């Protein structure tokens, strides 16, 4: 019993020795942030000047930028212009379709309905059908004008070659003179050939030329 009593206080003595050691370690850990905290104030005295000054400048610049935007009206001028342009396009299209009620295209409605149904296009609005007929009419007129220009170029080159040939045979009489007078009457006429039409359609990506034949 005496031995047990002697051991118990010894253990009790050793435990407080360990506790202060742990306490000393904890104090050493706590002292490190204290030393860092003591070092920070010296840096904090300088840091606020460098950090807060741009913040104040940014706060001062932001209202100025807003004021400049309001003065220039960038938020209120650019966007409405875009919307007005879109509205103007829609308005012109509506007015154009309204004018199609009184318009009768050169292409008959029966022929237009036939080719639209043949291509698989279904539409109930007659104004849209007339608009498609007008575009087809415009396309045909452009192709005809281009073909006419090609025919003029072709006839001009052929007339130049015929005049040189006629100058060489000048002085021949009789039936040759009668034939030449008939040809002179045909010079004022323009004849559109398939070659002229194929050359005009080739500009629009349509090829009408016959494939080359090889034996």
Curated annotation (Swiss-Prot):
Subcellular location per the Swiss-Prot or TrEMBL entry: Nucleus
Annotated coiled-coil segments of the chain: none
Polar residues: bias regions: 23-42
Keyword presence, Transcription: yes
GO molecular function: promoter-specific chromatin binding; RNA polymerase II general transcription initiation factor activity
Ranges where the record places region Disordered: 1-77
Family listed: Belongs to the TAF10 family.
Reported function: Functions as a component of both the DNA-binding general transcription initiation factor complex TFIID and the transcription coactivator SAGA complex. Binding of TFIID to a promoter (with or without TATA element) is the initial step in pre-initiation complex (PIC) formation.
Domain notes: The histone-fold domain (HFD) mediates heterodimerization with TFIID-specific components TAF47 and TAF65 as well as SAGA-specific component SPT7.
Protein name: SAGA complex/transcription factor TFIID complex subunit Taf10
Organism expressing this protein natively: Schizosaccharomyces pombe (strain 972 / ATCC 24843)
Gene: taf10
